[in-house]
């Protein structure tokens, strides 16, 4: 029962496969690759036509259990790819490099004299605290990328890397302007008046809340990894099943929740620096959108940031 997989890209050739041999998805991709100068299988997007729509083939057993000779299949070259693990590593490495450079420059007296904002006092202690909080946050993320996270997709188009890195290299990198006194809209007297009202006028308390949020975030990532491993062990490698226990019953995506809280406490520590506020706002909006997609997907109405409220 041979069928022809038609090419939707100029650089790819049509490929014929025999469904009677019950090939796996990997077998089909390898045959397509061999028929097209051994192009990487991660560049190949394999779809079938369903009600005039192109539906991706992702199940390893699709050609064994669902495919038949009445279906139309297509392939498309996605272009050069990069692994998702490397994407995340590049994203998180950016702020480490940018902040390390600007923090180092902020410790050189001649550079400070030349470039520090005239409207803000030079505060090397605050700079050091902010820098090490940033370093700890992204150091944790790099560790998780290398040793904790699993990715549902192996690769993405390499040209998307620059778009993905913008958020971290640029928006997070802008916070480092604060080492030179830029972006502080409030004077200390006014700011600490409100901090005192909120019982948050102790720096060690704010740092402790930041660290606690980071630890909760790390815990959530470990739980998600263990849950993913459990699902794979029981044959569910593709369909995401929500974790329904503990803090995951309160929040739709508690890893996002504590990520946001970490940046809230950092923003308090860094005296509501406008660049930190911008990064917090953009990050929160994006994670809120992702969280609501999870609520919709799982048919839940769990909180995003505050239990039973929001």
Curated annotation (Swiss-Prot):
One Gene Ontology MF term: very-long-chain enoyl-CoA reductase activity
Q: What membrane topology term does the record carry?
A: Multi-pass membrane protein
TM annotation in the entry: 86-106, 142-162, 166-186, 202-222, 243-265, 269-291
Positions on the Lumenal side per record topology: 107-141, 187-201, 266-268
Main location class: endoplasmic reticulum
Regions of this protein lying in the Cytoplasmic compartment: 1-85, 163-165, 223-242, 292-310
State which pathway it belongs to: Lipid metabolism; fatty acid biosynthesis
Xref: InterPro entries: 3-oxo-5_a-steroid_4-DH_C, SRD5A/TECR
User: Any further remarks?
Assistant: Present with 23600 molecules/cell in log phase SD medium.
Output this protein's name: Very-long-chain enoyl-CoA reductase
Organism of origin: Saccharomyces cerevisiae (strain ATCC 204508 / S288c)
Species classification: Eukaryota, Fungi, Dikarya, Ascomycota, Saccharomycotina
């Amino acid at each position: 029962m041979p069928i022809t997989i038609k090419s939707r890209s100029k650089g790819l050739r049509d490929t014929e496969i025999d469904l009677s041999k019950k090939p796996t998805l990997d077998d089909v991709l390898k045959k397509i690759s061999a028929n097209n100068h051994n192009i990487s299988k991660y560049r190949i997007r394999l779809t079938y036509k369903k009600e005039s729509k192109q539906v991706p083939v992702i199940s390893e057993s699709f050609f064994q259990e669902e495919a038949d000779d009445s279906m139309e299949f297509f392939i498309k070259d996605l272009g050069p790819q990069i692994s998702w693990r490397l994407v995340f590593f590049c994203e998180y490495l950016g702020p480490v490099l940018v902040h390390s450079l600007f923090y180092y420059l902020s410790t050189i007296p001649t550079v400070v004299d030349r470039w520090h904002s005239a409207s803000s006092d030079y505060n090397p202690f605050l700079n050091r605290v902010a820098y090490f909080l940033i370093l700890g946050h992204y150091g944790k993320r790099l560790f998780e990328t290398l040793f904790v996270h699993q990715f549902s997709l192996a690769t993405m188009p390499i040209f998307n890397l620059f778009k993905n890195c913008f958020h971290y290299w640029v928006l997070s990198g802008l916070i480092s302007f604060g080492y030179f006194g830029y972006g502080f809209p409030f004077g200390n007297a006014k700011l600490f008046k409100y901090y005192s009202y909120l019982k948050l006028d102790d720096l060690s308390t704010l740092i402790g809340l930041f660290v606690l949020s980071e630890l909760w975030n790390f815990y959530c990532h470990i739980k998600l990894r263990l849950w993913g491993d459990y699902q794979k062990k029981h044959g569910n490698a593709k369909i995401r099943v929500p974790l329904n226990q503990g803090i995951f019953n309160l929040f739709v995506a508690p890893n996002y929740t504590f990520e946001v809280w970490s940046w809230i406490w950092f923003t308090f520590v860094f005296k509501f620096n406008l660049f930190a506020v911008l990064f917090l706002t953009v990050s929160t909006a994006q994670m809120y959108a992702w969280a609501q997609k999870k609520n919709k997907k799982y048919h839940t109405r769990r909180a995003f940031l505050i239990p039973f409220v929001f």
